[in-house]
Amino acid sequence: MKAAPVFLITRKPEPWRPQNNGGMSFTPAVLPINATEFKVACSNCNLRELCLPVGGLSEPELERLDLLVASRRALRRGELLFRSGDPFESLYAVRTGFFKTRVSSKDGRDQVTGFQMAGELLGLDGIGADRHTCDAVALEDSQVCIIPYGQLEALSREFSELQRQFHKIMSREIVRDHGVMLLLGSMRAEERLAAFLLNLVQRLHARGFSQSELVLRMTREEIGSYLGLKLETVSRTFSRFQEEGFLEVKQRDI
């Protein structure tokens, strides 16, 4: 079976299919929110309970948070949201699209450290050292809401519920890291890939997608980098899953 650059696990048209931009580079666009044209606010966002859960905030508190999240940024596929070493200023809530985070070794090799989808936060890596420790790259045309961290921190000191929710987000990241350590330290290749696919299904299902269909925006090489597997091993494992009837591969569809 030939290695495809991207896998899709779906049998129906999917609005998140990557666009081919011909390798062109684009200047980042930071767009101010215009309430009369396209209101983007935490209080009316259908991803708010996934991104920064604010269900316990009062109406006035939500309005303060809406003022804080006052801009968004559009990125093309392959564009960097931030890179390792950049000053840490903001968190980024993924509104649409898909990202990967990666770190580079001294010999120039890239290691994928995570994949982020709509409703998840990017930039938490920069809190400790006031600089980002990884690159964040858009895997498809994407959009993020910009959350200035200093202002969020100040607002959290005023609103205990917001502070509590932010602590829960940090805890969730720690639990995720523990899960990755378990994945890499004790599982065979088949178990790693199966756990990876199931995790994506669960996260997408929380966003309203089917539990039996999945879209992969990353290449097999990127999956292998994340799972600590060689490209050939990832390809063989996908082939084995298909032979055993666990999934069906048809070009970009699985």
Residue spans for each PLM region:
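Glycine-centered, phosphate/nucleic-acid-interacting loop/turn motifs that mediate DNA/RNA or nucleotide
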Residues: 245
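Polybasic "coupling" helices that flank or enter modular domains
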Residues: 157-230
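Cyclic nucleotide-binding regulatory module and flanking cytosolic helices
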Residues: 22-77, 121-122, 126-128
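Short phosphate-coordinating micro-motif centered on Lys-Gly-acidic
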Residues: 80-86
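Short, Lys/Arg-rich nucleic-acid/phosphate-binding segment
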Residues: 250-254
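Glycine- and acidic-residue-biased ligand/ion/polar-headgroup-sensing regions
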Residues: 78, 89-102, 118-119
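Basic amphipathic alpha-helical segments that dock to polyanions
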Residues: 240-241
